[in-house]
Structures are given as structure tokens and as C-alpha cells.
């Protein structure tokens, strides 16, 4: 599929009996596969998971990856896919992008689920810096170390398939460029926290207690939103849907179906 003139890859999980459409937005440097642990649990819904332009196996043009560029990408994607009033779930940068989109298209989403959303940090944390380093120098050792730090729990061990997939993707042409360009755009938009009060869409915010990539203290900013629930998952780091998918699903199912 072409979005904004660029080839975009996406995963679609259909359920003809469901009236709910979920759109999952991955984080910085990730792909649709980052949600793979959750796929079997979401079978009661229609689920659409794009590789954002510049990431995964979508095209990686040499453009400036601004927040506005990603918002236009999403709008075109929704129109081409004929998606209306979805529940959008965004992890980290994907969460920030969902919020930025909502500030422009205020009634487009039915509900929003945010997992450790970006948009509030003034500067990268040590763990985030290590993740960026692993993206720029994608060896098995660097990536495994960064992913394990992001989980920040001994109970979860990063699997080799995830590591190898990330290494392979970050070695694709222009992958490092899009990573850095997007990171710069994220840093310019850390004032998102001051506009959260403007978003009146029902929102669920989930954070891992052990998250040191975007520390759990940042959840306080999101309590300013008019219609919001906030939950903290114990024993999880930056990606609770990867680390404890069954427990995570129990948290989101009630919110989605209510």
C-alpha cells in the first residue's frame, strides 16, 4: 500500500463479527512485530498494525521526520484503509503520535490507550540513550543489552528472534537516518505535556513500575487529561504488553469494551 506516496507495510488481523477496530502504533525504531505477543489475545477485534513510514519494513525516504509528517501519514493511512472511530493504542513514540494526532483531529478516535507514552521528557534518559546507541550500532550484543535494560526485570529475558529482527531492520537503507530524524522531532515536542488537558477522548494510560526508559513518574502529567484512567503494572519495564501480555490484555479489554 502507498501512503503519502511511500510504500507502507502493515499487519491486519480480521474478525468479521467484531464492530471494534484497534489500531496499534509501535514505538521508536520498532515494527508491527513488537506487538506479536499480544496478537493471539486480540482475536475478538479487528486489528490493524502499520509499520510507520521510516520504520519496520515500510519505505524509509530521506525526508524530515517531523511530528506533522507522521500526523499526515496517519491521516492518509486511515483514509486509505477506510478506518473510522478506531480505538488507537500507542506505545512510547506511538503514544505520543496518537496524542499529537488527537490535538488536530479531536473526534477521530473512539478511545486511546497509551503505554509509557513519549512526549514529556526534556532529555533522553540513560536507557533511552543506550537504545538509540543500539539502533546506530546494531550488533547482537548492543541490541540485547538495550532491550534487557528497557524491560528492567530479571523475570523477562529478551528472545533471540526479537534481537535479530531489530538488528536486521536497523541495517536496512536509511533506517538509522529515520531513527535520528524522528528522535530530533520528539525532542522538539516535549511540551506536549502542557496540552494534555485539551484532549477529551476517553484515555487509558498504562506504565510499567520498573520503566527507566521513560520513568513511571511521568504518569502524573497524564492525570491532567479530562477523561483518563491510569494504571501501573508491577514487575514491568517499558513494554508491559511484551513482558506480561496476558495481564496487560486483562487491563485493556474492559476499557475497550466499555
Regions found by a protein language model. Name each.
Residues 1-22, 43-46, 83-84, 256-258:
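Alpha/beta-hydrolase fold catalytic core
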Residues 11, 49-89, 93, 250:
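Active-site loop/oxyanion-hole signature of alpha/beta-hydrolase fold enzymes
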Residues 12-57:
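Conserved HGGG/HGGXW glycine-rich cap/lid loop of the alpha/beta-hydrolase fold
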Residues 8, 123-125, 140-198:
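Conserved alpha/beta-hydrolase catalytic His-Asp/Glu region
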Residues 99, 103, 109-139:
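Flexible "cap/lid" loop of the alpha/beta hydrolase fold
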Residues 34-36, 58-64, 123-125, 216-217:
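Conserved catalytic-core motifs of eukaryotic protein kinase domains, centered on the activation segment
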Residues 242-254:
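Post-His helix in hydrolase/transferase enzymes
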Residues 204-236, 242:
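Conserved loop-alpha-helix segment in the C-terminal half of the alpha/beta-hydrolase fold
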Amino acid at each position: 500500500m502507498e501512503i503519502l506516496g511511500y510504500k507502507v507495510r502493515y499487519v491486519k488481523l480480521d474478525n468479521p463479527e467484531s464492530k471494534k477496530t484497534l489500531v496499534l502504533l509501535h514505538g521508536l525504531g520498532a515494527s508491527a512485530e513488537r506487538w506479536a505477543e499480544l496478537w493471539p489475545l486480540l482475536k475478538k477485534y479487528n486489528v490493524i498494525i502499520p509499520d510507520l513510514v521510516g520504520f519496520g519494513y515500510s519505505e524509509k525516504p530521506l525526508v524530515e521526520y517531523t511530528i506533522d509528517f507522521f500526523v499526515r501519514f496517519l491521516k492518509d493511512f486511515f483514509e486509505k484503509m477506510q478506518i473510522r472511530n478506531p480505538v488507537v493504542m500507542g506505545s512510547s513514540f506511538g503514544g505520543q503520535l496518537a496524542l499529537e494526532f488527537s490535538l488536530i483531529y479531536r473526534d477521530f478516535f473512539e478511545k486511546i490507550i497509551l503505554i509509557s507514552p513519549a512526549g514529556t521528557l526534556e532529555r533522553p534518559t540513560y536507557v533511552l540513550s543506550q537504545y538509540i546507541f543500539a539502533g546506530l550500532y546494531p550488533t547482537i550484543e548492543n541490541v540485547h543489552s538495550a532491550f534487557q535494560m528497557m524491560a528492567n526485570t530479571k523475570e523477562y529475558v529478551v528472545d533471540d528472534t526479537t534481537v535479530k529482527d531489530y538488528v536486521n531492520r536497523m541495517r536496512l537503507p536509511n533506517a538509522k537516518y529515520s531513527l535520528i530524524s524522528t528522535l530530533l522531532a520528539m525532542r522538539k515536542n516535549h511540551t506536549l505535556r502542557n496540552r494534555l488537558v485539551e484532549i477529551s477522548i476517553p484515555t487509558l494510560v498504562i506504565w510499567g513500575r520498573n520503566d527507566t526508559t521513560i520513568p513511571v513518574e511521568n504518569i502524573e502529567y497524564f492525570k491532567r487529561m479530562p477523561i483518563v484512567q491510569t494504571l501501573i503494572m508491577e514487575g514491568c519495564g517499558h513494554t508491559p504488553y511484551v513482558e506480561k501480555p496476558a495481564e496487560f490484555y486483562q487491563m485493556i479489554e474492559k476499557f475497550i469494551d466499555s
